[in-house]
Amino acid sequence: MLEKCPIIALDFSDLASVTTFLEHFPKEELLFVKIGMELYYSEGPSIIRYIKSLGHRIFLDLKLHDIPNTVRSSMSVLAKLGIDMTNVHAAGGVEMMKAAREGLGEGPILLAVTQLTSTSQEQMQVDQHINLSVVDSVCHYAQKAQEAGLDGVVASAQEVKQIKKQTNEHFICLTPGIRPPQTNQLDDQKRTMTPEQARIVGADYIVVGRPITKAENPYQAYLEIKEEWNRIK
């Protein structure tokens, strides 16, 4: 069975911070990393080229949400960078998601963001005026993403089982908000799970940020999470 790599969220503001962080890892340890808005807006496409030159895979997490033509054109540009995975907001609708798929082509994995893991039931109903449960809203977006031809969704691990039931077992579920069991830090993630819990419910990819990037020994923290993520019981 192919070993799974946790996706490391490179939540840094510049290249210097990234290179300092990556120095904790052996060169032969090929990683799967997430580049978000802050780092991409700071460094631009050059950060993609640098990470790819090291042999690592990249999830470019920009959550595009615009009119279909703009998203199609933007995805066409991103496809040329050689990224391995990217995403759009499912709230942009089926036509926008179809346009994203057309622009990106068939190479990189394309996911739709459902509800952010920082979103609570109350926030969804009051701020977004969506009178559904979080899981029902997430599954609705997942079905629309599948209809649009996307590969899967970004959702909390708490919704994975229901998503798989309402789409299919091969529909990808990438889950942020993953925290090791010993983590007691409070942050903006509200719907979280441990790596083991995410594996048990059927998540296909997990994203881990601060428990690795803020660890005293990032490589050791990464290995422990990777071992828990791949553990067979």
UniProtKB/Swiss-Prot annotation:
Known catalytic reactions: orotidine 5'-phosphate + H(+) = UMP + CO2
UniProt pathway: Pyrimidine metabolism; UMP biosynthesis via de novo pathway; UMP from orotate: step 2/2
Protein's GO biological process: 'de novo' pyrimidine nucleobase biosynthetic process; 'de novo' UMP biosynthetic process
SMART domains: OMPdecase
Active-site residues (renumbered): K63 (proton donor)
Positions contributing to substrate binding: 11, 34, 61-70, 117, 179, 189, 209-210
Disulfide bond recorded as keyword: no
Any Gene Ontology CC annotation: cytosol
GO molecular function, one term: orotidine-5'-phosphate decarboxylase activity
Keywords, in A-Z order: Decarboxylase, Lyase, Pyrimidine biosynthesis
EC numbers: 4.1.1.23
The organism's place on the tree of life at top rank: Bacteria
Keyword Translocase found: no
Residues forming coiled coils: none
Function as written in the Swiss-Prot or TrEMBL entry: Catalyzes the decarboxylation of orotidine 5'-monophosphate (OMP) to uridine 5'-monophosphate (UMP).
Subunit structure: Homodimer.
Protein family membership: Belongs to the OMP decarboxylase family. Type 1 subfamily.
Entry protein name: Orotidine 5'-phosphate decarboxylase
Species whose genome carries this gene: Streptococcus agalactiae serotype III (strain NEM316)
Name of the gene this protein is made from: pyrF
